[in-house]
Design a protein with these regions (language model features):
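Disordered, low-complexity segments in secreted/periplasmic proteins that are enriched in proline
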Residues: 28-30, 34-38, 368-427, 487-488
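Alpha/beta-hydrolase active-site loop
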Residues: 178-202, 620-626
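Histidine-bearing beta->alpha loop at or near hydrolase active sites
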Residues: 574-577, 600-622
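Catalytic-loop region of hydrolases
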Residues: 30-122
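Primarily recognizes the serine-hydrolase "nucleophile elbow" in alpha/beta-hydrolase
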Residues: 198-283, 367, 374-388, 392, ...
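Short, surface-exposed "cap/lid" segments of acyl-processing enzymes
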Residues: 93-150, 570, 577-587
Length: 633
């Protein structure tokens, strides 16, 4: 496979290295970043002519009063025009258009128009991210009003930016190969935001009011957009595709956003393996966790490593209690304030369900297929597969198994697809609780207060959140996980990235080698991959950091306070999902609530819901719009 490599200036990399060594809080508001000269210095020559928006290429949907345009190239040197263009959808009230001879329109901003209390100067700008399994989001090639209608009616500007996905793919001819994987997807989104800000005098919407949303891998990248604003780690990647870096006056252009909506974010991949084993894997002895496999021992060691990590994170609860784990007689580190906090999150989720639900209640069991997100909560959910970008591959679906090739098989990280559904109706809350307790009491229910208490995390997991992924849930020894593709680098389309797992394999070889399925080559495979660099010359650990929101939000990491973090956050997860540990979204919430400059964190886990756009009540589209309005009005 031939991949285009672009030269990155030595000066930029020198400045970048120096800046990363600096200490102190560099966080500023988004508006501040637009009004001040930047110390950004580089030999990069920005192609301003190529980055200027053409106001004469609008189209008009007279029926719905929408101005729209597609194929807007947001960088001057794209790796792939299949992905690195965007569509812009604007309520007609915000523009004044003059029809051209070819049927298109030349438009100017109309400052007097108003929709839902917003104007062309105050309207939020929405960025949908439909990237299940960190797959690509193809750029829109046609107009689709229905997918944007709710947002346009709310007075929002809707921007669908194509973005590369987790794999290094080959184009239709040999010279069209391009780099994918981390951090190229988020790089593309940042370039789209920067392009819009460069052209803000020509485009409607308040560029201080970018809000992203996504589910699963899209939720993860939405979280990254919220956490990595203006991170200098992305500069060489942005330059390599010809992104807008400075405006006409030499001011640095920000890629920070105002708000991030994240459903079931599969993120924090540096400790995702270990979190999965602590939260779920340690309680099971089937499949790869069978006692005959070395992975049963690895599972326990991973769980213990997660506890060590938690004890260094410095997480605090809402009342200021330091959250830590301690050893326990049963299980791996099933003690401490952190354990109690996670147990309380589970209990709160159940009690919210009891409070929200009117009985008789019908429960439908069955997992939603990723890429075709169905209803959540009490109504219809956001169907991310119907976004104008079409998500996933160009057909809007997950990449087929094995697409990426290489040493791994390219299996999707969230596969399983739709399962047959079974429905059951419960007449009362007591009937529902009795059903959950059918094989032993693990929930105590008080009908007078309509509240419940749960005995342990283990009981909850065994009944509602089974470990369906193998040991090495995100980085397996055979390189078969989707995340292994995410950290491929062009030369190898699947690579190991978990340094903790690598250390455990090396440190505990004498124990693991007692098992018949042990292979000493696992150690060298991990060690070699962790030394690899991508086409920009970035090492594996840095790439992992760039795709970890906690790297920017927690003082445990050197990236703390090196980015402009979004002010507004909303996180929802189906607590029954088996795709990732409950600790992932919980740690993200805790870090955000303790981060200076974050104004609000709206968080909930949704009882009985799987890996989907889960909501306690209502539907995800309306709830998202209501939340954005609450943040801004």
């Amino acid at each position: 496979m031939i991949l285009r490599k672009k030269c990155i200036s030595i000066l930029l990399l020198t400045v970048l290295t120096a800046s990363l060594c600096a200490c102190g809080n560099t966080s500023k508001s988004i508006s501040d970043s637009k009004d001040n000269k930047s110390s950004y210095s580089s030999t990069y020559n920005q192609n301003n002519e190529a980055l200027k928006f053409d106001t004469a290429k609008w189209n008009y949907d007279e029926t719905n009063n929408v101005y729209w345009t597609i194929g807007v190239q947001y960088c001057s040197d794209p790796e792939s025009t299949d992905y690195e263009t965007m569509a812009i959808y604007v309520p007609g009230e915000y523009m004044t258009g003059t029809k051209n001879s070819d049927g298109t329109y030349t438009c100017e901003i109309n400052k007097s128009g108003e929709v839902n209390g917003y104007t062309s100067e105050t309207a939020p700008i929405i960025l949908p991210i439909d990237t299940p399994g960190y797959s690509a989001q193809a750029a829109p090639t046609s107009y689709n009003y229905d997918s944007a209608a709710s947002y346009l009616k709310a007075g929002y500007v809707y921007v669908v930016a194509g973005m590369r996905g987790r794999s290094s793919l080959q184009g239709t001819s040999e010279d069209q190969g391009f780099s994918g994987g981390a951090p190229w997807g988020v790089t593309d989104l940042k370039a789209a935001v920067r392009y819009y800000r460069l052209n803000e005098s020509l485009l409607p919407g308040d560029t201080d009011r970018f809000f992203s949303y996504g589910m699963s891998g899209g939720g993860a990248q939405s979280a990254l957009m919220g956490a990595t604003g203006d991170s200098e780690l992305y500069y060489p990647y942005l330059e390599s595709i010809g992104s807008a870096m400075t405006d006409a006056d030499g001011n640095v252009i920000s890629d920070a956003i105002a708000g991030s909506m994240d459903w079931c974010p599969v993120t924090s991949l540096d400790y995702a393996n270990e979190a999965y084993e602590w939260n779920m894997g340690q309680y099971f002895t089937t499949d790869t966790r069978d006692s005959s496999s070395f992975k049963s021992a690895l599972s326990k060691d991973m769980a213990a490593s997660f506890a060590e990590y938690v004890n260094k994170l410095g997480l605090k609860s809402e009342d200021g209690t330091e959250l830590t784990l301690s050893e326990s007689e049963a299980g791996v580190y099933n003690n401490g304030t952190y354990y109690d906090y996670i147990l309380n999150e589970i209990q709160t989720s159940l009690n919210n369900f009891l409070s929200d639900t009117t009985f008789p209640y019908t429960y439908t069991q069955g997992k939603i297929q990723i890429g075709n997100t169905a209803s959540s909560g009490g109504g219809e959910g956001i169907d991310l597969s119907r976004n104008p970008g079409q998500g996933g591959n160009k057909d809007g679906q997950m990449p087929p198994q094995g697409q990426s090739g290489g040493r791994g098989q390219g299996a999707g990280m969230m596969q399983g697809g739709a399962q047959s559904s079974e429905s059951k109706t419960y007449e009362t809350a007591q009937d529902y609780i009795d059903s959950l307790n059918s094989d032993g009491t693990w929930i105590a229910y008080d009908s007078q207060t309509n509240t419940a208490k749960i005995t342990s995390i283990e009981d909850f997991v065994k009944h509602c959140k089974e470990a369906t992924k193998p040991v090495g849930a995100f980085d397996s020894v055979d390189l078969s996980r989707g995340e292994n593709n995410l950290f491929g680098n062009g030369q190898s389309t699947a690579l190991h990235f978990d340094s903790v797992e690598s250390s455990l394999l090396s440190k505990n070889e004498s124990n693991y080698s007692k098992y018949s399925d042990w292979d000493s080559s696992y150690i060298t495979s991990f060690e070699d991959d962790l030394k690899s660099e991508d086409s920009v010359g970035t090492d594996m650990q840095t790439r992992v950091n760039m795709y970890n929101p906690m790297y920017y939000l927690s003082s445990y990491y050197s990236g703390y306070n090196t980015s402009k973090v979004a002010k507004y956050w909303r996180i929802r997860t189906g607590i029954n999902q088996t795709d990732t540990a409950l600790t992932v979204e919980t740690n993200l919430k805790l870090a955000l609530k303790n981060y200076d400059g974050v104004e609000s964190v709206d968080f909930a886990t949704v009882w009985g819901k799987p890996h989907t756009t889960a909501e306690r009540t209502g539907n995800s589209t309306d709830n998202f719009i209501s939340w954005v309005d609450e943040c801004l009005k």
